[in-house]
Amino acid sequence: MRSEMASERVFFKGDEAKQVEMVPGALRRTLGHGGRMLLAEFNLAAGADVPSHSHPHDQVGYVVSGSMRLTVGDETRTCEAGDSYYIPGDVPHRAVTIEDALVIDVFSPPREDYLEG
């Protein structure tokens, strides 16, 4: 076990994760985080549009249920339940939900703005 682990939180209760509306129809909860990564859950209503944006964090996601059109750079794909994706840091990306979706994302390093809410 790493010595710095003593100062890091290692367990997170799901019912303690605060839900934040990012844009209409897009709700986020930060489920857990450590020194080098952050885990987030997104509940996306059909028609929700997360506009094109970028951030310096690498992002890996998994579609638990539903579907969405995901644009990463110049490539657009339909992602359905069971699909996953990788978005390199600083690459513009956008998501438009086709049907209600539950998506899990990991960010590295952790997004500071997601630690606040």
Predicted features, each with a name:
Residues 24, 40-54:
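Conserved short histidine dyad/triad with adjacent acidic residue
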Residues 74-89:
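Short acidic-glycine-tyrosine-enriched beta hairpin
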Residues 64-65, 80-81, 99:
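A cytosolic small-molecule/anion-sensing beta-strand core signal
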Residues 67-69, 76, 92, 102:
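Structural motif
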Residues 89-113:
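Ligand-binding loop in jelly-roll beta-barrel domains
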Residues 1-36, 116:
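A short, N-terminal "cap"/entry segment at the start of jelly-roll beta-barrel domains
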Residues 43-45, 55-70:
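Short, conserved beta-strand element in jelly-roll/cupin
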